[in-house]
A protein has these predicted regions:
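PLP-dependent amino-acid enzyme catalytic core
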Residues: 1-157
Length: 157
């Protein structure tokens, strides 16, 4: 029986059939699978399937850890703005987590970085600020630090 059919019949009892009100609660709920055919005899080989995270990325775990740490330290409250200098993956995950938690998210990216990644963050509710390509990562970090300091935003690290 499919997960959906089980939910409709009221007897879906496996973790993969749970219904969540908060996408961040699914982060890290990734299976470990024993690889039977690729490992040499006598070797137990396991893989952690991180692509089961909401955005199919290990960066989902990092993003929720950064946000929860900021919340525990009292640096993040409803309505806060989170800013990060990013090449994309962590920023995408932070945009998702911030959208769920009620924070504004701003990513600082160099103009040389992927246009596709720059498009995903606004789709998740984030804003993207572009820095000149020749400044690279250093320029991104400097801009993020400057904006965090000047505007009182939470700098994701």
């Amino acid at each position: 029986m499919s997960c959906f059919a089980g939910i409709l019949k009221g007897n879906a009892n496996t973790r993969r059939c749970e219904i969540y009100d908060d996408i961040t609660k699914t982060i890290g709920q990734t299976p470990i699978v024993k690889v039977n055919k690729l490992a040499p005899e006598g070797v137990n080989l396991y893989v952690k399937c991180e692509y089961f995270n909401p955005l199919s990325s290990v960066k989902d775990r990092l993003a929720i850890a950064i946000i929860e740490d900021g919340e525990k330290r009292g640096e993040l409250k409803l309505g806060s703005t989170v800013i990060e200098a990013t090449s994309g993956n962590t920023g995408i995950a932070l945009a998702m987590v911030c959208a769920q938690r009620g924070y504004k998210f701003v990513a600082v990216m160099a103009a040389s970085l992927s246009i596709e990644r720059r498009k995903v963050m606004p789709a998740l509710g984030g804003e993207v600020i572009i820095t000149p390509a020749p400044l690279g990562g250093t320029g991104m970090v400097q801009k993020a630090e400057e904006l965090a300091e000047r505007r009182g935003w939470f700098l994701a690290r």
